[in-house]
Every structure is written in C-alpha cells, then in structure tokens.
C-alpha cells in the first residue's frame, strides 16, 4: 500500500512538473530546496526572481514587477536586477532581515541541451556576510545559535550559545542561566539567530533575524564531534569546552548552517574561545544604554564613548575597540599591560613615535576580512593586491614597534605577530598585477612573467597587428612578390592576397583559401596557427587567468592562520595607538589599580560631555569601605547624572585599558556596573515606567556585590510621594547593609539626607548652584553636604514654562509649605524654599529683583583679558560672593 501511494505521488508530481516549461521546472526544483529564501536566478546579464519572490523583492527593493507568459496556466510574475549591481540589492535585503540564494549558470550554453545547468553557489543571510559591499567597516556581524538545555523534569536549566563572525572566523561559546539570555544577546547583538522550533519563544523580541533550524542539528554529542572535526583536534579540553553541553549543541547547528550557506568548508574557523561571566565586568542592557557606550539613548552612533575613542587608522582597530568596550576584563593585569604600551608609545622618540606609527597604519588594509574571504575562496583581485601591499609594509612597521617595545611587553608580543607568513608575500608579488582589475572576468589580474602561456596569449591579442606586418614583410622577401598583402576579414579570417599576375611565384606551402576575379587568397601553416591563437586568444587568456587566479587562492589557503595572526596584531596595535593619541590630545592620565576596595578619582571629567562643551567643571569622587554610598542632591540640570555617569565611564575606561580623563585615578576590584538612570514605558512588554524602574532596581539589589559600582538616579519618583520615599529609603539602606557596594545615589527626597546619621558609610554631597532673583546659575561643582534647595521652579522657568504658570506655582508652593508647617509633617521633597510672598496678579509686572553680586561681577568682566593669576584670584572672589547673598554684599 505504501509503495502504491509513493508511486502515485511521484506520478502526480511528474504530471504537475510536465505542465511547466523546462526552464521553469529547473527554477521550481531549485526553489523547492530554498523555500524560505529569495532565489536570484541568473539569466544572461540579469538575476531574475519569479512568482512570490518577485512580488516580495519588488516591494522591498522598489523593483518593477512585470508579467511574461504563463507556466502551468499561471502568469509568471518577474522582477530582475543587473548582475553587476546585485550586491547593492543584497545589502538592502539583508537590512530587512531577508536571505537570498544566488543561483548561477554553471553549464556551457553552447553545449547545453535544454536549459543551461544552474545551481545555488551561495546563500546570503543576515548573519553570514563576508563581502565588503555588504558589511559595515566598523562593526562585526554575528551568526548565533541558541540551544536550551533541560533538567530531568523537562525544565530549562541552561542556555548554550555559539556565535561566529564569519568574516573573521572568530567562534565563541558560552553557557548561562535562562534569565541571563537577554543581557547576553544585548551584548553580542547577533544579526541572525538560529533556533529550533521549540526554543524560538525564548528569544526576546527585536534581537535579530530568527531562522528556524531542525532540532536534530542541536544534538550535543554530534555538536561536540563537529567542533573537534572543525578545529582538527581529538578533544576540546585545550579550549575549555569539553565539559560544555548545550553550547556544543549550539555550535554544531551553527557550523552546519554556516557551511551550507557558503557551499564549502569553513577553513578559517580554527580557534575557539569559551566566554565565562567571571572574566569580564558585568554590564547589563540598561547599563550599556545609559552609559551610551556605542549608541546614544536616542539611537544614534554619536556622541558616544565609542565615537570619542575611535580615532583608529584601520577598520580592524575600530571593530576591536567596540569589542573591548563591551568586554572590559575584571582582572587588572590586561588593563595594566595596555596602559604600559600606551605609555611607551607616548614616550617614544619622534622618528619612531606615535605620529609616525599611525601614519604607517593608515596604509594598512583590512587583513582580517580579506583573510576571511581568502578562506572562503571569494577574495577579489584587489583584496590580494591590498594584502600584498600591506605585507610589503610590515617590515618597516615592525622596526618602528621594535624600537619602543623594550618598555612594554605587549608591544613586543605585537611586534612578533606582525611577521607575514613565509612565502605569502613572494607569491602575491609574483602572481598579482600591480594594479589589478576589480574582477577576474575583466582581465589584467595576473602579473606578467607569472605564466608563460598567459603572456603568450596576451601578446597575441595585444600584438596582432605587428605580427601581421612582420609576416607580410617576411613573405614579400621570401616570395619576391612586392605587392603581397596579409589581411583579415570576418568571413574568411586571416589570409595572404596575391594578384593574378604573381601567382606563379607562390610557394608550395601556400594553400588556396579564396579565388577572386583579380587575385588569389592563401593561408599558410604559420598563419593558420596564428589565426587559431589570435581568434581565441582573448577568450583563452581570460580562461587561463581565471584558472591561475583560482590556483593562487588555493596556494594561499595554508597561510590563513598566519594572516589571522597578523590581522589580530595589527588591530591591537592600531587600537593602542588610538588610545595613546586620545590620551595625548585630551590630557588623560594612566589610572592605578589596587587590591583594596575603593574608587578614587581626582578632578575627573565626563569624556563625552567635555568634548561637547567649551569648559567642563572637573570633580572628585571618593568611595571606600568607610564611604560606600554618596547621597547626591542638587537642582535638576545641576549635573548629578553627568557626575554619576562620568564616574562609571572613568572606571570602565580604566579596565578597558585606556587612559582616563582625570588628574589621577585609583581603582580597587570592580566586578559589575549597574545603572538605574531614567526610565520610560515599555509598551511592547506591557510595563509602566515605574515597573521598569523597579525591575532594574530589583536586579541591582539581587546581584550587586561589595565590588559592584551602582548608579541610582531618583529612584521611587514614578509613584506617589510616600511610596517613592519609602522605597528609596529601603533601597538605600539595603545597598548599605546587605550589598555594601560602591553606590552613587541621586535623590530629591529630603528624608534621605538623614541616612548618614544611621549609616556612617553614607555621605551627603551636592551639586552647587547660585540663585539670582528667581533665576539660577549652575556651577556644576560637587561639594560636601546636602543641597538646601531643589530650584525646581527656576529650572522650569529656564525651560520656557510661561510666567503665569511659574507665578501660580510659587503661590501654591508657599501654601503647601505653610500647610506643612502648621501640621508639623515632615518635609518629604527637596527642598523647602525661603518664604514666598504673594505674587502680583498676572497683569502686574513683577517687582525688580536685586541682582546677585556674583552674577553682577561675572557680567562685568571680559574673560579674554584675564591672565591665569587674575583668573585664579577672581575664582576665589566669586566663591566668596556666591556664599553671601545680595544683602550680605551690600553690608
């Protein structure tokens, strides 16, 4: 019975196929193998898409949708793109999260019976990009596979991740608890996620394109063996991955998928890194966003810490910087080695110094990505010429590094890494033309002298005219026929023409080709041989060049690991040089590390804000076992958030390995950085602003340790005053008594300023401001003690709130304060303003306020006329005036 059903199904399929044209049968067969992928089907100079693919591509790529003929009674909808412009269309598709199968003609149209043979040669997906036209120079593209491990009760116990940068060959694994998945994906930012049907719901929304993969691809035993085969090892012990379970299953699925999209082995995936949470300073998603490491809160790329630090001369250095910022090591050893290298670069003599080194680095190609394309046999001619020129420049670059490496072990290691693979430069120099064409099909890629046959074919093609002149001269001399001519036409090819009166002088080796009324045309063995070569020389030269180029790619494969080593060394050297340039240009210093708990920053500055303003007020920050929590008060816009963020950024920069914007800085161990700064409704997740705020606070209270740095900004403001105050008080107490972490706690709740009376480890500081009438001048200086006013109405006035609203607010504030005093209720919010008299009606002009003497003095002076000593004296004078009111000054 089963056999009969199978036979009838096959017969039905054959009948259905017979209703289509042979070409459409071929297309539908290929499409059936890639049902969820747009198939780009090569037809001559175009890639065509059909049926639903055509409709989708027309909509996404703004293509013209046409309709030609019918197949099996169905109109054939078509959309196409020129083959030479396909990369730009693929780039657009990838941005939409789509994948495309590139189907090429592999048969010879001249010998094909029926449709030319075609097959899919590569599949372009969001996570498997390697072509330069599809990639951003300064960011990596990751393909990630996710495997959920379950315990005996069937409950998810861990999640295994494997992610691959196909352009470089870097493969990483990690195993983590299910509740850590969101933070891990936020850090990795994969472009494409592979998951089995039953685990797709585990992936948070908006994390990348999701591709369904058969569950059996995630088999742990098969994945472990596939990893061993890929890395050519008997065991994964050397990589620390033998004990992993779900991560190895994820790696197996990832390697199957990546190899299938490329249609070949992944020769450049030769190393493995297992990431452990304890290696890096923990940064949860909200911390990465709030500190604006690589993206602003508005979603732009600048101004961020990354945009400020990225003065790298190579794309490799820029990508490494992005990785370092998201992976600051907990151990200070790595950071200290980087600081030592930066110091050596800054102290180097001018002839081998920083500027000279960076000038040389600007000539370096993207060796990392070129190597990836080499391994996949997709490198283009200019990739190879760029690689050759880079390797040729390495000896001089190594000499510069060697001159300064004696003072920094890291530079010595990098100098050794910059040695090109033996024989690689020689091969590239001999084989590749000085300035090759962009594509092999254009010719002119292989250098002259590399292959005698190719040189001969080129000579024939290029020197055809000269050969004919030389032959004509020789034949005239040999035959004595003075008017003998050697010519060519498209019908008969090359020939020797002799007039009728001279035919008796024709040699025996002449063979008649054509008889005319007044002349005979002949061919000789030599001319026939030349004709065969000349007429096919260009075509044969291109074919020979293609074969030679493929041979060069194959010959370079053994050098892949050496090229990867060079790329890694160049990227790190470039990034350290960029750190040195930033330190020199922006007046940054090398931080110090200690095993003692504490953070000490002397005259610290916010690196990004400082670059955006003309003058930045530097501030100190001291946290230690006796001073674990700073209660920060002061007006809105006074600089509380900036001060908190700059402390976290300076600490992060120190552990990343950069110098820091401060006069001096000293750090004890830091394991995690948490931020609870600002919030908004999570509409997609169905969470209110207050719920988002409490969720972030809960994560901090549950996970912060004595080595964690916590930033809390106005916690509790999203609910009623009493609820908010109670929560803020309890959270601050818990951070002091249980977590005992470094904490910067900004608040407007007056009651919290009494916390140091209960906990000596807490201290009050405030951001200073000067009131002028109903206005305010922010001084942005951090001073000891709590603030005495919040200046909320003054800030509202600065924001442009209409004057009638401000006056009404002042009247109501006075009423509330009087009511509060009469009821003897505690003051809940910062801070009680001085008694306020009734404001005049809205149609009456306000009484003129007495200008504050500090502001008057500021308005009198011309900053351009001040000498350094005068400026210092003036600063002391303003400080004295600021502490006194107008009445004191008048006295």
Swiss-Prot record:
The keyword ATP-binding applies. GO terms for cellular component: cytosol. One of its GO terms (molecular function) is damaged DNA binding. It comes from Burkholderia mallei (strain ATCC 23344). This is DNA mismatch repair protein MutS. The gene is mutS. SUPFAM superfamilies: DNA repair protein MutS, domain I (SSF55271), DNA repair protein MutS, domain II (SSF53150), DNA repair protein MutS, domain III (SSF48334), P-loop containing nucleoside triphosphate hydrolases (SSF52540). Belongs to the DNA mismatch repair MutS family. This protein is involved in the repair of mismatches in DNA. It is possible that it carries out the mismatch recognition step. This protein has a weak ATPase activity. ATP binds at residues 634-641. Signal peptide: none annotated. Keywords: ATP-binding, DNA damage, DNA repair, DNA-binding, Nucleotide-binding. HAMAP family: MutS (MF_00096). PANTHER family: DNA MISMATCH REPAIR PROTEIN MSH1, MITOCHONDRIAL, DNA MISMATCH REPAIR PROTEIN MUTS FAMILY MEMBER. GO terms for biological process: mismatch repair. The keyword S-adenosyl-L-methionine does not apply. It comes from the Bacteria. InterPro entries: DNA_mismatch_repair_MutS (IPR005748), DNA_mismatch_repair_MutS-lik_N (IPR007695), DNA_mismatch_repair_MutS/MSH (IPR017261), DNA_mismatch_repair_MutS_C (IPR000432), DNA_mismatch_repair_MutS_clamp (IPR007861), DNA_mismatch_repair_MutS_core (IPR007696), DNA_mismatch_repair_MutS_N (IPR016151), DNA_mismatch_repair_MutS_sf (IPR036187).
């Amino acid at each position: 019975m089963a056999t009969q059903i199978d036979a009838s199904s096959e017969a039905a399929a054959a009948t259905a196929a017979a209703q289509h044209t042979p070409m459409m049968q071929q297309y539908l067969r290929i499409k059936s193998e890639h049902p969820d992928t747009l198939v780009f089907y090569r037809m001559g100079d175009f890639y065509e898409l059909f049926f639903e693919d055509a409709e989708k591509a027309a909509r996404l790529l703004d293509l013209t949708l046409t309709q030609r003929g019918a197949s099996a009674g169905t109109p054939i909808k078509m959309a196409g793109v020129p083959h030479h412009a396909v990369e730009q269309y693929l780039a657009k598709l990838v941005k939409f999260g789509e994948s495309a199968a590139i189907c090429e003609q592999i048969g010879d149209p001249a010998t094909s019976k029926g449709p030319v043979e075609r097959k899919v040669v590569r599949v372009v997906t969001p996570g498997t990009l390697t072509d330069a036209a599809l990639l951003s120079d300064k960011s990596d593209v990751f393909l990630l596979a996710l495997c959920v491990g379950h315990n005996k009760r069937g409950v998810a116990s861990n999640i295994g991740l494997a992610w691959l940068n196909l352009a470089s060959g870097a493969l990483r694994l990690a195993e983590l608890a299910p509740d850590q998945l969101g933070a891990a994906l936020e850090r990795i930012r994969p472009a494409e996620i592979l998951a089995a049907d039953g685990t797709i719901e585990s992936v948070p929304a908006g994390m990348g394109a999701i591709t369904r993969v058969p569950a059996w691809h995630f088999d742990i035993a098969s994945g472990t063996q596939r990893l061993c085969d890929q890395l050519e090892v008997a065991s994964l012990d050397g990589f620390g991955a033998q004990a992993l379970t779900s991560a190895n299953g994820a790696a197996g699925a990832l390697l199957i998928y990546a190899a299938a999209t490329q249609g070949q082995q992944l020769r450049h995936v030769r190393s493995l890194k297992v990431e452990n949470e304890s290696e890096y300073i923990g940064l949860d998603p909200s911390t990465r966003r709030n500190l604006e490491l690589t993206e602003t809160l508005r979603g732009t790329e600048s101004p961020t810490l990354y945009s400020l630090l990225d003065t790298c001369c190579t794309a490799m250095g820029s990508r490494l910087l992005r990785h370092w910022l998201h992976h600051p090591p907990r151990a200070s050893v790595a950071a200290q080695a980087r600081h030592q290298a930066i110091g050596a670069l800054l102290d180097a003599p001018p002839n081998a110094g920083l500027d000279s080194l960076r000038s040389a680095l600007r000539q370096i190609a993207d060796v990392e990505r070129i190597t990836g394309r080499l391994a996949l046999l997709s490198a283009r001619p200019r990739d190879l010429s760029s690689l050759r020129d880079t390797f040729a420049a390495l000896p001089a670059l190594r000499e510069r590094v060697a001159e300064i490496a004696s003072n920094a072990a890291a530079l010595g290691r990098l100098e050794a890494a910059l040695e090109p693979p033996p024989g690689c430069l020689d091969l590239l120099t001999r084989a590749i033309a000085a300035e090759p064409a962009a594509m092999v099909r254009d010719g002119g890629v292989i250098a002259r002298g590399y292959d005698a046959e190719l040189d001969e074919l080129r000579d024939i093609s290029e020197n055809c005219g000269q050969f004919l002149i030389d032959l004509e001269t020789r034949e005239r001399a040999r035959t004595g026929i003075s008017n003998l001519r050697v010519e060519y036409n498209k019908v008969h090819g090359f020939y020797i023409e002799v007039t009728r009166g001279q035919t008796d002088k024709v040699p025996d080796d002449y063979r008649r080709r054509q008889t005319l009324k007044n002349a005979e045309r002949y061919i000789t063995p030599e001319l026939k041989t030349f004709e065969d070569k000349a007429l096919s020389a260009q075509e044969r030269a291109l074919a020979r060049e293609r074969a030679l180029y493929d041979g060069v790619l194959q010959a370079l494969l053994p050098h892949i690991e050496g090229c990867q080593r060079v790329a890694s060394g160049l990227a790190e050297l470039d990034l350290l040089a960029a750190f040195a340039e930033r330190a020199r240009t922006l007046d940054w210093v090398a931080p110090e590390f200690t095993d003692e708990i504490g953070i000490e920053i002397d005259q610290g500055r916010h690196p990004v804000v400082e670059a955006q303003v003309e003058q930045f007020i530097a501030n100190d920050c001291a946290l230690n076992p006796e001073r674990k929590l700073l209660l920060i008060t002061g007006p809105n816009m006074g600089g509380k958030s900036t001060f908190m963020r700059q402390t976290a950024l300076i600490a992060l920069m120190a552990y990343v390995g950069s110098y820091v914007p401060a006069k001096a800085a000293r750090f004890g161990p830091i394991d995690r950085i948490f931020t609870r700064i600002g919030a908004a409704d999570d509409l997609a997740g169905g969470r209110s602003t207050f719920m988002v705020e409490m969720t972030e606070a809960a994560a901090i209270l549950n996970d912060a340790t004595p080595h964690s740095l916590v930033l809390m900004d106005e916690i509790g403001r999203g609910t009623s005053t009493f609820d908010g105050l109670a929560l803020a008080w309890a959270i601050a107490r818990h951070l002091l008594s249980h977590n005992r972490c470094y904490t910067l706690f900004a608040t407007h709740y007056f009651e919290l300023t009494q916390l140091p009376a209960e906990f000596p480890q807490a201290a009050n500081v405030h951001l200073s401001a000067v009131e002028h009438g109903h206005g305010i001048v922010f001084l942005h200086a951090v001073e000891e003690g709590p603030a005495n006013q919040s200046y909320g109405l003054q800030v509202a006035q600065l924001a442009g709130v209409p004057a009638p609203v401000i006056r009404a607010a002042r009247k109501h504030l006075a009423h509330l304060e009087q009511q509060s005093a009469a009821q003897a209720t505690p003051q809940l919010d910062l801070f009680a303003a001085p008694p306020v008299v009734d404001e005049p009606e809205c149609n009456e002009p306000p009484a003129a306020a007495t200008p504050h003497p500090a502001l008057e003095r500021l308005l009198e002076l011309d900053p351009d006329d001040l000498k350094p000593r005068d400026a210092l004296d003036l600063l002391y004078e303003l400080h004295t005036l600021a502490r006194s009111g107008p009445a004191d000054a008048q006295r």
